[in-house]
Amino acid sequence: SFGWAAVQRLLDFDLRQIRIFSRDTKKQAKMERCLHQANPESAKKVTFWPGDILDLSSLEKAIEGVDCLIHAAALKQVPDCERFPIQAVQINVLGTENVLRTAVAAGVKKIVCLSTDKAAYPISAMGISKAMMEKVAMAHAREASGESKICCTRYGNLMCSQGTVIPLFISQIRSGKPLTITNPAMTRFLM
């Protein structure tokens, strides 16, 4: 996942602390175990904060004293966003509003919001919600008066990351099931 890869890269730098804020405590526990096994000394720099971007009090505590923030929280599975579009808006748009408002108020200097290639000319609930997330971020960037630098970056399908088609296709092939192709004319780009 992006979070795991980002933490591994960030540990290469001389950072005082890396905070992982997530509502998925199972993933946090797994990451903590893996970090301690790989390098117990570096792992001391990483702290885990359970919470939800829709819960302002947990967000405020986690962001206090932070210099840079990477906002990767999202409802990112296209089928989930299609089935639950209100949750896509709540998490991807309103959750981002909470993160940005809290981060700017706390004096965070640099904020990067992760988006998706599906936000360009969106046709899905996920793409639409991420396009709106970008609009929210850019509105905050204009209002931040230079105190907080805010940007968005788009990336596409990361090969073998959670929720991409490759693990799904491997599972379907191994179990002898047909591959689920949404649209045979579609081209999928993987990084």
Task: Tell where the protein language model's regions lie, with residue ranges.
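Conserved glycine-rich Rossmann-like NAD(P)H-binding loop of the short-chain dehydrogenase/reductase
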Residues: D14-K30
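Conserved residues in the N-terminal Rossmann fold of short-chain dehydrogenase/reductase
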Residues: S22, W49-P50, Q90
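Residues in the short beta-alpha loop(s) of Rossmann-like NAD(P)-binding domains
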Residues: D24, C34, D117
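Conserved Rossmann-fold NAD(P)-dependent oxidoreductase catalytic core, especially the SDR/UDP-sugar
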Residues: H71, L75-K135, A139-H140, I150
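NAD(P)-dependent short-chain dehydrogenase/reductase
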Residues: A125-M126, A131-M191
